[in-house]
Amino acid sequence: MLKLIIPTIMLLPLTWFSKKRMIWINTTTHSLIISTIPLLFFNQINNNLFSCSLPFSSDPLTTPLLMLTAWLLPLTIMASQRHLSNEPLSRKKLYLSMLISLQISLIMTFSATELIMFYIFFETTLIPTLAIITRWGNQPERLNAGTYFLFYTLVGSLPLLIALIYTHNTLGSLNILLLTLTTQELSNTWANNLMWLAYTMAFMVKMPLYGLHLWLPKAHVEAPIAGSMVLAAVLLKLGGYGMMRLTLILNPLTKHMAYPFLMLSLWGMIMTSSICLRQTDLKSLIAYPSVSHMALVVTAILIQTPWSFTGAIILMIAHGLTSSLLSCLANSNYERTHSRIMILSQGLQTLLPLMAFWWLLASLANLALPPTINLLGELSVLVTSFSWSNTTLLLTGFNMLITALYSLYMFTTTQWGSLTHHINSMKPSFTRENTLMFLHLSPILLLSLNPDIITGFTS
């Protein structure tokens, strides 16, 4: 694991010692090279000695998320260049340092073998994210968004710390492998039920589950482009990863406790999708589907079958790339029109035809059209939820219909129609932006050729 962690840490001195003209080139090229390192972890059988140590290790569940995290850093750096063009050099370097330190803490969170270490790095991701939102956001409401983000996450994760301390006192170890192999089955008592809630609540806030999701639209809307990309693509996946790791340890208690949360996630999925149909703010319309898609992931994880786990992992990777792509497209609109209101940026297809092509592909990926990897994830979750209960097909099917409606609504509102009067002149789409969209879309399409590499430890 050090062959991924050390090069990422070395990006920090590279950033601070780079000259003004070379800072973007250096950080982008080096982070792109680093993003290829997790490819070595996909061959788990032969290379297991190289990707496993006492504090850090990778397995088929961790590796796709590590790959997503590493792949996203060069994309966030590329997307932020216009946003930071008027900032002094020291602030550019500080911004890049925040992104790199966030990547380091995410890599360590995903690869930690001790649960207390996992908790520490899980909380560490808050600090750079909060700094990015509150310092580099565009509107004054960013401070309110930062407060929501901080308090929801901290209050949700405090019971997790108490549960971890209790587990360590009773069992004497918090090693994930040891707990998976040695723990006895938990009986269905009040104390154990409370412990299950304490373990999972932090991750349900992070996912977020419907009802605990109020921080996400605020943080997503007020964050700068890199903050929105990382928040949607990777930070929400921390919740899914934590739930998948810990619900295996907490079996068979999960089967008893899952029903209310399954119902809440299925209901929340419909509600948040319906909210999207009434949105006028483009970034808000991109933020709310994250709650809807993550509700599907919560459903898949709580059903606790190998196929549902596979669907959850695929859906997390697919949603990470798609949501990040939509955030980039919304940012490209915002940089030209200086407004997030969709009606004020309508008719852009006539001015930016290539960008309209990216918008079409992103919208189709969002509604899980073949040959995207999103389709495979949604189908896996759909089939497993149907085998768990037939009535879920009505809810999930209705959700897919609403998803198609708001995806096409987003595309038609921003691209079609007559141009508004305040748009007199507009810069064309840059090569940097087109490259950024291509680097988002190519994994979504290419993974559908060989989805085995991200199906997790169930394959």
From Swiss-Prot:
Supply the EC number(s): 7.1.1.2
Query: Main subcellular localization, coarse class?
Result: mitochondrion
Keywords, alphabetical: Electron transport, Membrane, Mitochondrion, Mitochondrion inner membrane, NAD, Respiratory chain, Translocase, Transmembrane, Transmembrane helix, Transport, Ubiquinone
**Protein localization:** Mitochondrion inner membrane
Q: Single Gene Ontology BP term? A: electron transport coupled proton transport
**Can you state which reaction this protein catalyses?**
a ubiquinone + NADH + 5 H(+)(in) = a ubiquinol + NAD(+) + 4 H(+)(out)
What InterPro entries does the entry give? NADH4_N, NADH_Q_OxRdtase_chainM/4, NADH_UbQ_OxRdtase, ND/Mrp_TM
Keyword Mitochondrion annotated: yes
UniProt GO molecular function: NADH dehydrogenase (ubiquinone) activity; ubiquinone binding
GO CC field = mitochondrial inner membrane; respiratory chain complex I
Q: Does Plastid count among this protein's keywords?
A: no
- The transmembrane segments are 22-42, 60-80, 94-112, 113-133, 145-165, 196-216, 224-244, 257-277, 284-303, 308-330, 351-371, 391-411
Q: What class of enzyme is it?
A: translocase
Topology in the lipid bilayer:
Multi-pass membrane protein
**Can you tell me which family this protein belongs to?**
Belongs to the complex I subunit 4 family.
Q: Which NCBIfam families match?
A: NDH_I_M (TIGR01972)
What function does this protein fulfil?
A: Core subunit of the mitochondrial membrane respiratory chain NADH dehydrogenase (Complex I) which catalyzes electron transfer from NADH through the respiratory chain, using ubiquinone as an electron acceptor. Essential for the catalytic activity and assembly of complex I.
Summarize subunit and interaction data from the UniProt record for this chain: Core subunit of respiratory chain NADH dehydrogenase (Complex I) which is composed of 45 different subunits.
Query: What is the protein named?
Result: NADH-ubiquinone oxidoreductase chain 4
Query: Gene name?
Result: MT-ND4
